[in-house]
């Protein structure tokens, strides 16, 4: 799971917000014009999903902080 294992819950939430903003920017750029790395959208989307899973695990008590 990439390098998110050592993040605290607050760090994960902040990183998720940052990635969501970056993903939104890439979506706009792809609609309006040229994107340098089109696969970056997929990577960011998957990272957001990983973070969502880990945050949910912390909230359910499956994963300990």
Swiss-Prot record:
One of its GO terms (molecular function) is structural constituent of ribosome. The lineage of its organism: Bacteria, Pseudomonadati, Spirochaetota, Spirochaetia, Spirochaetales. Keywords: Ribonucleoprotein, Ribosomal protein. GO terms for cellular component: ribonucleoprotein complex; ribosome. Pfam families: Ribosomal_L29 (PF00831). Disulfide bonds: none annotated. InterPro entries: Ribosomal_uL29, Ribosomal_uL29_sf. This is Large ribosomal subunit protein uL29. It comes from the Bacteria. SUPFAM superfamilies: Ribosomal protein L29 (L29p). Belongs to the universal ribosomal protein uL29 family. The keyword Thylakoid does not apply. GO terms for biological process: translation.
